Amino acid sequence: MGMKSKFKRFFELDDDASMYEEDAVSRDFVEEVEEPRRRSRTGVKQERETGQNVVSLQSVQKTAKVVLLEPRTYDEAQEIADQLKNRKAVIINLQRISHEQAKRVVDFLSGTVYAIGGDIQKLGMNIFLCTPDNVDVTGTITDMIQDGYRS
């Protein structure tokens, strides 16, 4: 005796009883079909007007902005951070600031860049590039310089 028949006996289900119930259900079921409605000309016009809300992705894409800044004190670091928060890449020239304040600015901007998911790279002596997460930078300056001298 199989497991299936044990369950049927336990629940007192017979094949005949289950077939009878299925037949009764299938006879009572009547499918109602609606005919498609015809659209009026005004309905089509309204659909066309609402369909104009679709905008191509190329027109939405904004041009990337790069801001060049040359801070003279540590207090200007917040202005640089605000530019990064506004999703603009920033090149910072720290040549006109003391070495101690320049370190503080770089530390502050490193934290800002980390918080927004961006990146900071050294471009040259006291020159840094800070980018938000929407800007990808490929390559490094030292690689490019070495490749240029080898040619």
Swiss-Prot record:
A Pfam family this chain is assigned to: SepF
GO biological process, alphabetically ordered: division septum assembly; FtsZ-dependent cytokinesis
Cross-referenced InterPro entries: Cell_div_SepF, Cell_div_SepF/SepF-rel, SepF-like_sf
Annotated compartments: Cytoplasm
Gene Ontology CC entries for this record: cytoplasm
Keywords for the protein's UniProt record, in alphabetical order: Cell cycle, Cell division, Cytoplasm, Septation
Keyword Cell cycle: yes
Sequence segments annotated as region (Disordered): 31-53
Domain of life: Bacteria
Chief localisation class: cytoplasm
Job description of the protein: Cell division protein that is part of the divisome complex and is recruited early to the Z-ring. Probably stimulates Z-ring formation, perhaps through the cross-linking of FtsZ protofilaments. Its function overlaps with FtsA.
Record note on quaternary structure: Homodimer. Interacts with FtsZ.
HAMAP family listed in its UniProt record: SepF (MF_01197)
Family listed: Belongs to the SepF family.
Protein name per its UniProtKB record: Cell division protein SepF
